[in-house]
Protein backbone atom coordinates (compact mmCIF):
# COMPACT_ATOMS: atom_id res chain seq x y z
CA UNK A 1 0.00 0.00 0.00
CA UNK A 2 1.51 3.33 -0.95
CA UNK A 3 2.10 6.19 1.45
CA UNK A 4 -0.69 8.49 0.22
CA UNK A 5 -3.32 5.74 0.34
CA UNK A 6 -2.13 4.66 3.79
CA UNK A 7 -2.35 8.24 5.04
CA UNK A 8 -5.87 8.69 3.63
CA UNK A 9 -7.00 5.45 5.24
CA UNK A 10 -5.42 6.56 8.52
CA UNK A 11 -7.45 9.79 8.29
CA UNK A 12 -10.64 7.80 7.66
CA UNK A 13 -9.94 5.62 10.69
CA UNK A 14 -9.33 8.76 12.77
CA UNK A 15 -12.70 10.13 11.65
CA UNK A 16 -14.28 6.80 12.57
CA UNK A 17 -12.82 6.91 16.11
CA UNK A 18 -13.89 10.54 16.46
CA UNK A 19 -17.43 9.65 15.41
CA UNK A 20 -17.61 6.58 17.67
CA UNK A 21 -16.38 8.54 20.67
CA UNK A 22 -18.54 11.63 20.29
CA UNK A 23 -21.68 9.77 19.22
CA UNK A 24 -21.26 7.51 22.27
CA UNK A 25 -20.94 10.37 24.76
CA UNK A 26 -23.85 12.15 23.06
CA UNK A 27 -26.04 9.05 23.25
CA UNK A 28 -25.03 8.12 26.81
CA UNK A 29 -24.90 11.47 28.58
CA UNK A 30 -24.33 10.00 32.05
CA UNK A 31 -20.92 8.55 31.27
CA UNK A 32 -18.25 9.67 33.70
CA UNK A 33 -14.71 10.60 32.68
CA UNK A 34 -13.36 7.11 33.40
CA UNK A 35 -16.01 5.47 31.23
CA UNK A 36 -15.35 7.92 28.41
CA UNK A 37 -11.66 6.99 28.53
CA UNK A 38 -12.46 3.40 27.51
CA UNK A 39 -14.88 3.91 24.59
CA UNK A 40 -12.24 3.84 21.86
CA UNK A 41 -10.19 1.19 23.67
CA UNK A 42 -13.12 -1.23 23.52
CA UNK A 43 -13.56 -0.66 19.78
CA UNK A 44 -9.85 -1.02 19.08
CA UNK A 45 -9.49 -4.16 21.22
CA UNK A 46 -12.43 -5.88 19.53
CA UNK A 47 -11.07 -5.02 16.07
CA UNK A 48 -7.54 -6.21 16.83
CA UNK A 49 -8.66 -9.34 18.66
CA UNK A 50 -10.87 -10.49 15.79
CA UNK A 51 -8.22 -9.72 13.20
CA UNK A 52 -5.50 -11.40 15.24
CA UNK A 53 -7.62 -14.53 15.74
CA UNK A 54 -8.08 -14.71 11.96
CA UNK A 55 -4.32 -14.33 11.41
CA UNK A 56 -3.46 -16.92 14.07
CA UNK A 57 -5.91 -19.48 12.67
CA UNK A 58 -4.55 -19.05 9.15
CA UNK A 59 -0.91 -18.98 10.27
CA UNK A 60 -0.99 -21.97 12.61
CA UNK A 61 -3.31 -23.86 10.26
CA UNK A 62 -0.61 -23.53 7.58
CA UNK A 63 -2.93 -21.65 5.25
CA UNK A 64 -1.36 -19.23 2.82
CA UNK A 65 -1.87 -15.49 3.04
CA UNK A 66 -3.01 -13.83 -0.14
CA UNK A 67 -2.84 -10.20 -1.17
CA UNK A 68 -6.29 -9.47 0.26
CA UNK A 69 -5.32 -11.01 3.62
CA UNK A 70 -2.20 -8.87 3.85
CA UNK A 71 -4.21 -5.80 2.84
CA UNK A 72 -6.68 -6.43 5.67
CA UNK A 73 -3.81 -6.90 8.13
CA UNK A 74 -2.28 -3.63 6.94
CA UNK A 75 -5.65 -1.92 7.44
CA UNK A 76 -5.76 -3.35 10.96
CA UNK A 77 -2.37 -1.81 11.76
CA UNK A 78 -3.47 1.56 10.32
CA UNK A 79 -6.60 1.29 12.47
CA UNK A 80 -4.42 0.68 15.53
CA UNK A 81 -2.27 3.72 14.74
CA UNK A 82 -5.42 5.82 14.32
CA UNK A 83 -6.72 4.59 17.68
CA UNK A 84 -3.52 5.55 19.51
CA UNK A 85 -3.42 8.93 17.79
CA UNK A 86 -7.08 9.75 18.44
CA UNK A 87 -6.88 8.51 22.03
CA UNK A 88 -4.08 11.03 22.60
CA UNK A 89 -5.93 13.83 20.77
CA UNK A 90 -9.37 13.29 22.30
CA UNK A 91 -7.96 12.19 25.64
CA UNK A 92 -6.04 15.44 26.03
CA UNK A 93 -9.37 17.27 26.03
CA UNK A 94 -11.78 14.75 27.52
CA UNK A 95 -9.95 12.46 29.98
CA UNK A 96 -6.46 13.85 30.45
CA UNK A 97 -5.75 12.25 33.83
CA UNK A 98 -6.28 8.76 32.37
CA UNK A 99 -3.47 9.25 29.85
CA UNK A 100 -0.77 10.27 32.30
CA UNK A 101 0.38 6.78 33.28
CA UNK A 102 2.74 4.54 31.31
CA UNK A 103 -0.31 3.08 29.57
CA UNK A 104 -1.13 6.52 28.19
CA UNK A 105 0.93 8.85 26.05
CA UNK A 106 4.23 6.97 26.35
CA UNK A 107 2.65 3.62 25.51
CA UNK A 108 0.69 5.11 22.61
CA UNK A 109 3.67 6.91 21.07
CA UNK A 110 5.88 3.82 21.31
CA UNK A 111 3.21 1.65 19.67
CA UNK A 112 2.67 4.20 16.90
CA UNK A 113 6.39 4.10 16.13
CA UNK A 114 6.57 0.28 16.35
CA UNK A 115 3.53 -0.05 14.08
CA UNK A 116 4.97 2.31 11.46
CA UNK A 117 8.29 0.44 11.54
CA UNK A 118 6.48 -2.90 11.10
CA UNK A 119 4.63 -1.54 8.07
CA UNK A 120 7.84 -0.06 6.64
CA UNK A 121 9.79 -3.31 7.16
CA UNK A 122 6.84 -5.39 5.90
CA UNK A 123 6.66 -7.51 9.07
CA UNK A 124 2.99 -6.90 9.77
CA UNK A 125 2.10 -10.60 9.77
CA UNK A 126 4.26 -11.60 12.77
CA UNK A 127 3.31 -8.32 14.47
CA UNK A 128 -0.39 -9.11 14.10
CA UNK A 129 0.05 -12.62 15.54
CA UNK A 130 0.66 -11.14 18.98
CA UNK A 131 -2.52 -9.09 19.15
CA UNK A 132 -4.44 -11.98 20.71
CA UNK A 133 -3.00 -10.23 23.76
CA UNK A 134 -5.86 -7.76 23.30
CA UNK A 135 -8.28 -10.18 24.97
CA UNK A 136 -7.35 -9.12 28.52
CA UNK A 137 -7.32 -5.48 27.36
CA UNK A 138 -10.88 -5.90 26.11
CA UNK A 139 -11.97 -7.53 29.37
CA UNK A 140 -10.29 -4.76 31.39
CA UNK A 141 -11.82 -2.02 29.24
CA UNK A 142 -15.31 -3.50 29.47
CA UNK A 143 -14.96 -3.76 33.25
CA UNK A 144 -13.79 -0.16 33.52
CA UNK A 145 -16.63 0.99 31.27
CA UNK A 146 -19.31 -0.97 33.10
CA UNK A 147 -18.69 -2.36 36.61
CA UNK A 148 -21.27 -5.11 35.97
CA UNK A 149 -18.92 -6.51 33.33
CA UNK A 150 -15.89 -6.48 35.63
CA UNK A 151 -14.41 -9.92 36.21
CA UNK A 152 -10.97 -9.89 37.82
CA UNK A 153 -10.56 -13.67 37.59
CA UNK A 154 -11.32 -13.68 33.86
CA UNK A 155 -8.97 -10.75 33.31
CA UNK A 156 -6.20 -12.40 35.35
CA UNK A 157 -6.50 -15.77 33.65
CA UNK A 158 -6.61 -14.33 30.12
CA UNK A 159 -3.69 -12.04 30.97
CA UNK A 160 -1.69 -15.03 32.22
CA UNK A 161 -2.57 -17.21 29.22
CA UNK A 162 -2.05 -14.62 26.48
CA UNK A 163 0.81 -12.55 27.87
CA UNK A 164 2.84 -14.75 30.21
CA UNK A 165 2.58 -18.27 28.79
Segments from the language model and where they lie:
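Membrane-helix and juxtamembrane interface regions of eukaryotic multi-pass membrane proteins
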Residues: 1-133, 137-165
Amino acid sequence: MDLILSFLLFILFCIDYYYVYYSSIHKYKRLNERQKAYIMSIKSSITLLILSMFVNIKYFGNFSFGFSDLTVINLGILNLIAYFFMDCVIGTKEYYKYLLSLSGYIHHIIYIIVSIVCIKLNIILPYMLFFVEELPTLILSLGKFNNNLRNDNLFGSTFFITRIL
